[in-house]
Regions:
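Sec/Tat signal peptide C-region and signal peptidase I cleavage site
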Residues: 15-22
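Short, charged beta->alpha transition segments
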Residues: 12-13, 50
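Residue-level detector of alpha-helix boundary/anchor positions
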Residues: 14-15, 119
């Protein structure tokens, strides 16, 4: 009886953890940015700080959650194609020459991420779709919006 109860609790915890990790994410932008859509290749360049300026001349800043956060697991796999430690090194290297306007900012919460994107001209970020508010604009990836079939950052 005790073994069955422990097994049920264990299965519940595993299922709950996998559902929590399968979040739908979205790319959001500062409203002053002229970018409404981005290709997957261009998104990778922005995330890796390989794109310094938008077509209108504004400096690009990418805002993200900590590479160790569960939210970033999918982004590490689908966008960066690198490990957490490699991404941490990339953040340090990318920001070294851009102290006044960092290439990559790390936020401690989705709320902080949205606020940083909203208040930083040229900023874009990746955030849980349920944290989006009217202070930021949603950017299409590969012609698709979040929750549309085939969207790159769909959680499942």
């Amino acid at each position: 009886m005790l073994c069955q109860r422990l097994l049920r609790v264990f299965i519940f915890v595993i299922v709950a953890a996998s559902l929590a990790a399968a979040r739908d994410l979205a790319v959001v932008s500062n409203k002053s940015n002229a970018v409404g859509a981005i290709t997957v290749g261009d998104l990778v360049k922005v995330c890796k700080a390989q794109t310094n300026r938008w077509p209108d001349g504004k400096l690009v800043t990418f805002v993200m959650r900590s590479p160790s956060s569960p939210e970033m697991k999918m982004v590490l796999e689908k966008v960066y194609g690198m490990s957490e430690s490699e991404l941490n090194s990339l953040i340090v290297t990318s920001n070294h020459a851009r102290a006044s306007h960092p290439a990559i900012l790390v936020a401690t919460s989705d709320e902080e991420l949205v606020n940083k994107v909203a208040s930083t001209p040229g900023a874009v970020g990746v955030v849980d779709v349920y944290s989006i508010n009217s202070s930021v604009a949603v950017i299409k990836i590969g012609g698709k919006l979040p929750l549309e079939p085939g969207y790159l950052l769909h959680g499942n």
